[in-house]
Design a protein with these regions (language model features):
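C-terminal-of-GTPase-core extension/linker across diverse P-loop GTPases
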Residues: 1-12, 17-170
Length: 170
């Protein structure tokens, strides 16, 4: 677990024939809470009978058990046969690039305007919560700050909507 603090990208290798263990989820949760980039590699893929079904199952279990890991890439490989092993390094480099990405304030503000127009923040005490602007405070991990008139009153569900939208769009 200490190695996670020193890592920039963590590759969590899972066995395709095993269910998500509690320990796997604990490690993934720790990686995310430490602000590290996470990539999930599912090994022994050559032994899987129904690949599409099993991969869908991995995505569903990850989404259910660890909603903050939404959008984490999952690659399948077989160390024994060498299948898809050449995709591992490019996937690591790609996720590192995303983790290291800087987005301009202007781009973020245009994005915020679109998101708040399509799905406005809720009212609080009869007053509309106005999201004034957004900026990227730091990268590694990408950290964003939204300024508003009632920032303490913004519901967690709306914050999650913004976070998930950021992940999808950038």
């Amino acid at each position: 677990m200490r190695a996670i603090k020193f890592a920039q990208v963590v590759v969590l290798i899972l066995d395709a024939q095993e269910k998500f263990e509690k320990q796997d989820l604990t490690i993934a949760r720790r990686v995310i809470s430490e602000g590290r980039a996470l990539l999930i590699a599912v090994n022994k893929w050559d032994l899987v009978k129904n690949p599409k079904e099993i991969l869908g199952d991995f995505h569903n279990r990850l989404a259910k058990s660890l909603p903050q890991a939404r959008g984490v890439p999952i690659i399948t490989l077989s160390a024994k046969t060498g299948s898809n092993t050449k995709k591992l390094l490019p996937a690591v480099l790609n996720i590192y690039e995303l983790w290291n990405k800087r987005i301009s304030t202007g781009t973020l503000n245009r994005w915020l305007d679109i998101k708040t127009t399509n799905h406005p923040p809720p009212l609080h005490g009869g007053r509309r919560i106005k999201l004034r602007y957004i900026t990227q405070a730091k990268n590694r991990p990408p950290t964003f700050v939204v300024f508003s008139n009632l920032s303490n009153e913004l519901p967690i569900s709306y914050s999650r909507y913004l976070v998930n939208s950021l992940r999808e769009d950038f």
